[in-house]
Amino acid sequence: MIGIIGQGFVGNAVYQKFKNYYDVFTYDLDESKSNSNVNEIIYKCENIFVCLPTPMNEDGSCNISIVETVLTEIDLITDNLETQRNIIIKSTIPPGTTAKWNHRFESLNIVFNPEFLTEANAVSDYENQDRIILGGVRPATTELKTIFSKVFPKAHIIKTDSTHAEMVKYLTNTFLATKV
């Protein structure tokens, strides 16, 4: 079972693809986009996508507080469970953040999985991606590679450390911004 917290254009794209292969539980503040709640997702799903906004602060830095709040909630609940949860971060976060979170949230295996979507074509972009980057530690990245291989059999899946994956996201965004 797969959980997805956040059903904006990224979370919805993940849902549209994964629902064809797994039972998928979704949660969003907009109840019309949810088929579950956060607690049910945490208890039932060993693999949880976090697709939440990380808006820019006034100083230009990335505001990761929404994601951290959700990770804290997941960590508090999973601390009492027998199995750890693989948390797949889709939100844009500064390099080094996933590594910091893996030290802070000991009951979670946090992996950064950058998205390269356009808002107008998010579902199509996600369904037709040719590369998937999983940034984190083993065994989480190995388990997730198996899951992603089933859903994206033709995509090239790259396992790396989380900081490199976060840098790839930032560098790609920078490159795309120069093309505007």
Where are these regions (language model features)?
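A short, flexible beta-alpha/helix-coil linker loop
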Residues: 53-58, 164-166
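Local beta-strand N-terminus motif with an aromatic residue
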Residues: 44-45, 84, 129
